[in-house]
């Protein structure tokens, strides 16, 4: 049925990087550029100068991080070597980048290094940024320690610090306790003149309570917001719509949409995308298609996530022709499918038992890329596993390793779940040996997630979709959405919530 991956498959050839002439001069050049940016004067091109300075600061930070040899060397000695040009703005960028890399301990090292510099002045912005980074990494105690350190340094907390603190608590595992803490800080903010809640505060809390499904508290926060001097914005509504939509709370989502209309807040493309994805997840395809038509008539323009969401949700319902019509519509509107779109197509074909078609898309994707995204490999491996083709998945992984595509924990987790569920001990042992060779040590969560495979099915029952998801595209399908409007009255996004 399937052609096994071979050495002649269209994987991009890896070329060794050419040596950089004068390799040691890169950092010096960036340092000089950053220093020169300090001397730029104001004038008609001041805005352009600011942009250039920001770009040069970002380049200096990248240069500093490169000199840590991928995190093997400590960052502080590198900072010491460039102490003459590194300033607060560079440290801010370092905090952000180190946070993305899960290197929160290095963030603290940079912070301690900052405190020793003559130019350092204790500032709320620094503490706010660090508290935010620690919170995102689940280091709540460290965030609280920084909050107390800030007070000891003579800084008085302001709204931004409390917003970061609320956000940090909401990243903790105990959501009930976290929400109670967040509300406590919120009430405290109201009592301090310099810490009055802003729309950012309300947005954080509204989204958090909507994610928890606490509609009563969401309504209370909206009422509080109506009575305050702060006005809701499109981010306010998008956060709540998205949270309700992902929870499958469609009625609650639609009530927020009605509220949005009553405040005359205009939906943006993210609003449309949230609605399309939410209705698609529930397989309410008639409403999903109505929202798509409304988007085409609006001043907004669809984005790749718009189409990717529709392809994914049609795929889950095994509506292959409708999903393919979305690709046609996409190209008709001048969009070129990106690698994420092709990954969505791979999974869609896997749901529809068209694994050979999925492999064809994957091969085209590999041929068109200079670098194979790991998510693309994972999509094809998942497609094989969904259809019980574990040997083909193992061969594809062999080919990927030969082509220097390095799998990560997510790759091994999806394969381990599939092999374990199929009770294929040989493939499980082979996989664990590969992980050991690569230095990936599975943790408790890895095995717990894999054990869930025994209690749930990777594939949905092959039942016929309901009345809202006919097996063939109708005149109202996404592919015809722009032209098939003459027989029915035009429907806006507001009317969708009312139907």
Curated annotation (Swiss-Prot):
Q: Which UniProt keywords apply?
A: Chloroplast, mRNA processing, mRNA splicing, Plastid, Repeat, RNA-binding, Transit peptide, Translation regulation
Taxonomy, superkingdom:
Eukaryota
Q: What is its main location?
A: plastid
| Localization terms from the record | Plastid, Chloroplast
Polar residues bias locations: 465-484
Q: Which InterPro entries match?
A: Pentatricopeptide_rpt, PPR5-like, TPR-like_helical_dom_sf
Q: Where is the composition biased (Low complexity)?
A: 1-12
BP GO annotations: chloroplast RNA processing; Group II intron splicing; mRNA processing; regulation of translation
Transit peptide range is 1-45
PPR repeat extents: 123-157, 158-193, 198-232, 233-267, 268-302, 303-337, 338-372, 373-407, 408-442
Reply yes or no: does the keyword Chloroplast apply.
yes
Q: Where is the signal peptide?
A: none
Summarizing the function annotation, the protein's role is: Involved in the biogenesis of the plastid translation machinery by promoting the splicing of group II introns in chloroplasts. Stabilizes the chloroplast trnG pre-RNA by directly binding to a group II intron, where it protects an endonuclease-sensitive site and stimulates splicing. Binds specific sites within group II intron trnG pre-RNA. Binds with high affinity to the 5'-UTR of the chloroplastic petA mRNA.
- Name listed for the protein in its UniProt record: Pentatricopeptide repeat-containing protein PPR5, chloroplastic
Organism expressing this protein natively: Zea mays (Maize)
Native organism taxonomy:
Eukaryota, Viridiplantae, Streptophyta, Embryophyta, Tracheophyta
Q: Which gene encodes it?
A: PPR5
